[in-house]
C-alpha cells in the first residue's frame, strides 16, 4: 500500500475548547472525534479519542513555558480542523498568551447546570485580548436540566457575557447538548438527540467560523536572524519567512531598532544554496539587499512589504508571569521593573510603566495587563507574542493588545 498523501483539498481551520473547569471541555472533544469516527456525519473523518487520552495531555514548551496541550484533528465534509484542548486552567491562560496553539475560533463550553462561572469569564476576556476572532457556544450537560426556563436563562447569561467582551452575543450560535450523552448513545449503538447536538455543533463551526486568511496572502514579513557581507555582492540577511511571499526584485523595508525604516530591493533569494523565484511562509532564506551596508541592518529588525508594519516603543500587553516552580521569579515586581523583551529575533530592554488600577505589584504566577516602554523601537503589531527574560531565564510571556505610540 502506498502511503496516503495529506490532501490539501479541504480548508484548514484551527479551533479549541475553552470554558470553566469540569464543564466538559475534554468530554466534548472526545464526543466530536467519536461521532465523526462512527461515520455519522457525511464526509466526516476522525480517529475516536477517549476522554482519558485527551485529559492526560502531553507537555509542550513554548517561549520557555511548559504547557499541557492535547491536539486532535478531524474533518467535516467542508473542512479539516486542528483542535486543541488543555486540561488545567493555568494551561489555557499560558496557551492563549504564548500563542502555542493559535485559534481561528473557540468553542466555549458552558454547563447548563451551572451557567457561566469565573473561568468562563476569564477565558472569554482572554480570547478577546489575544484576538480569537469567533466563538461558538456549546451548552453542555443539558441532560441534567429538565427545566426549559433554566436553559433559556443560562443561554441569555452566556450571550450577555459574550456581548460584554465585544463578541456579537445576539448572533453567536448556541448549541444545547450533552457530550457525555452523545458518547453513551454511541456506546449503546443508538444515536439520538445528543449525537445530533454534536452534529449541530460541527455544522455551526463550518458555517459560523470563517476560513482564516492564509499566511501566504498576507503582506510579506521576515524577522532578520543574521547579517553577512558577501564581497563583491553586498549584504545578505537570513531568516524564516513569517508570512507573505517574496520574489526577486520586490521592494522591501527594513523596520525596527532605528528611527526610520530603510527602503531597499531584494535582488536575489537563496535557500539551501539554491536560487529561489519565490519564498513562502516557513522557508529559511538568505536575501541579497541592494545598496545596503552591513551596518545598516542588524538582527532583531524585520524585512517587510513597505508600509505594512511600523516600529513602536510603547504598548499595552496581557502577560503571564511564570511561577517560582516554573523557573520564574521568586519575588514580585513593581512599576519601573526593567527586564528584556524578546519579539521575534529582537531583544530590547523595556520598562513596565503602568500596572492596572489598584495593583501595586505583580506576583509570580499572575496573569496581568501592563504597559511597557522600550528603549528602542521594534516592529510591533497587535497580537504579536513576546517573552520576558531577565538574567538569562524566561520570567514571563505576553501578547501585545494595544499599540500606544
From Swiss-Prot:
Catalytic activity reported: GTP + H2O = GDP + phosphate + H(+)
All copies of domain tr-type G, residue ranges: 10-213
Any GO BP: translational elongation
Keywords (A to Z) from UniProt: Cytoplasm, Elongation factor, GTP-binding, Hydrolase, Magnesium, Metal-binding, Nucleotide-binding, Protein biosynthesis
Segments for region (G2): 64-68
Region annotation (G5) ranges: 178-180
GO cellular component, one term: cytoplasm
A molecular function (GO) term: GTPase activity
Residues engaged in binding Mg(2+): 26
Segments of this protein annotated with the region G3: 85-88
InterPro entries the UniProt entry points to: EF-Tu_GTP-bd, EF-Tu_GTPase, EFTu-like_2, EFTU_2, G_TR_CS, P-loop_NTPase, Small_GTP-bd, T_Tr_GTP-bd_dom
Family affiliation: Belongs to the TRAFAC class translation factor GTPase superfamily. Classic translation factor GTPase family. EF-Tu/EF-1A subfamily.
Quaternary structure and interacting proteins, as annotated: Monomer.
HAMAP family: EF_Tu_B
Protein name: Elongation factor Tu
Gene source species: Aquifex aeolicus (strain VF5)
